[in-house]
Amino acid sequence: MVIALKRFSFLASIATLTVLNACATISLSDKSGEFYINNIPSSAELHRINYDLTFSLGFTNRIQTKKKNEVNFVAFYGTGLLIDWKEGNQYQPFRVYLATNVHVAAGLKNEADYLPYSQPDAELGWTVDFRLGKYTNVKDFVSPNENRIT
């Protein structure tokens, strides 16, 4: 009897969560295909929050080759999500906290990092450039037909 009640309560909780799940109850706009490709969401649209908090991350690593006078550079790109920020002072204007995927973060190499994280890697080198970007010009992504380009 106790096992039957536990099973019933488990199934009831799963059913309740399924019904109350926000992803299942929010309807997206009819123009979802066009929205994802060609539009920046307006402030009234559901996905504007995601757009405002998402940034393009780019960084370049300098790799010393076995030849003394030869240096290679490798570029990495990924997506970052702003999770917090901190107002700074006269020496440090502000600080941002970005979340990203492990495969993106693994490429960031800084010699001044905490020792376990600053081990040299012959394939990645050291990061010499970091870029934070945001696309705001929708016309760059509109299909040629909409731009009347033939």
Curated annotation (Swiss-Prot):
InterPro entries on file: Mycoplasma_peptidase_DUF31 (IPR022382), Uncharacterised_MG067 (IPR022381)
Keyword Membrane: yes
Domain of life of the organism encoding this protein: Bacteria
Keyword Mitochondrion: no
Topology of the protein relative to the lipid bilayer: Lipid-anchor
Subcellular location: Cell membrane
Lipidation (N-palmitoyl cysteine): C23
Residues lipid-modified (S-diacylglycerol cysteine): C23
Gene Ontology CC terms: plasma membrane
Family to which the UniProt record says this protein belongs: Belongs to the MG067/MG068/MG395 family.
Protein name: Uncharacterized lipoprotein MPN_587
